[in-house]
């Protein structure tokens, strides 16, 4: 038996209670979660405690776990690919910021609705005359996109077929190309773009169109190999995600963590390569 599971009640007690209570009695008392370590304000490595992750995703998941009576720890597991491997193997239970993909479904149980939305906006220089009201307006213009971006499958097909996009290793280089005039726009998340603009000192030089061109969700995803993966946990998480989506709390938490990230920039902490 996994050491994180509660010992449970005596067999006689389990037979006397309803099925819901019997199921809850065997729940995990502790979950280990991870995610991208370089994606502020969603998640990033805690500069004061590098073994842990902080950010909007961590705050929301910690709150949800407390409501369920479960202890949760957000641990740094390495870069994105390493974090995914840790969860797929079951060594860690939960991925906090999983994009919905067909390959992901082979190893993960996604909890709906998503923990956070990640609106992708069109970023341009402040002096740009480019007018974008819909994705089709980008046709014929040169743009850039970080290879680490995780768009929806539908928009990915559209971008591949219809847009002239340069893929860069990270968002830093995409924004630098924009300021140098090598591209006309960059596709980047609303909050990740703001965080990177602050990091690079470009906040006064860039602007973002208000209308998202893509809205990929960032999901909680439980490993198929986690000893804690059971119907009770998935059901409770789904209920809490539904309540969270209706509450409007996520945007306030994102704003707070954007300010938190900006405050950390005042200290000599390395900028993330998104």
Whereabouts are the PLM-identified features?
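Extracytoplasmic small-molecule ligand-binding "clamshell" domains
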Residues: 25-99, 103-107
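Periplasmic-binding protein-like
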Residues: 36-38, 117-121, 200-238, 260-271
């Amino acid at each position: 038996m996994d050491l994180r599971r509660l010992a449970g009640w005596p067999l006689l007690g389990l037979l006397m209670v309803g099925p819901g209570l019997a199921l809850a009695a065997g729940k995990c008392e502790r979950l280990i979660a991870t995610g991208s370590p370089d994606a502020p304000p969603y998640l990033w490595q805690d500069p004061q405690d590098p073994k842990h992750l902080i950010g909007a995703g961590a705050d929301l998941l910690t709150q949800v776990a407390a409501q369920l009576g479960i202890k949760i720890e957000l641990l740094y597991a390495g870069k994105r690919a390493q974090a995914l491997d840790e969860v797929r193997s079951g060594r860690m239970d939960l991925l906090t910021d999983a994009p919905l993909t067909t390959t992901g479904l082979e190893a993960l149980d996604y909890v709906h609705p998503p923990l956070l939305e990640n609106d992708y906006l069109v970023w341009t220089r402040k002096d740009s005359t480019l007018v974008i009201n819909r994705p089709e307006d980008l046709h014929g213009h040169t743009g850039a996109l970080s290879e680490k971006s995780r768009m929806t499958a539908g928009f990915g097909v559209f971008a591949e077929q219809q847009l002239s996009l340069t893929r860069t290793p990270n968002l830093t280089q995409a924004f630098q190309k924009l300021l140098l005039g090598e591209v006309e726009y960059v596709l980047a998340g609303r909050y990740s773009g703001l965080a990177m603009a602050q990091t690079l000192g470009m906040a006064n030089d860039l602007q973002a169109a208000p209308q998202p061109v893509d809205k990929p969700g960032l999901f909680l995803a439980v490993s198929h190999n986690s000893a804690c993966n059971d119907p009770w946990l998935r059901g409770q998480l789904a209920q809490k995600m539904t309540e969270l989506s209706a509450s409007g709390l996520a945007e306030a938490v994102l704003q707070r963590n954007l300010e938190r990230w900006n405050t950390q920039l005042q200290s000599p902490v390395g900028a993330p390569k998104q």
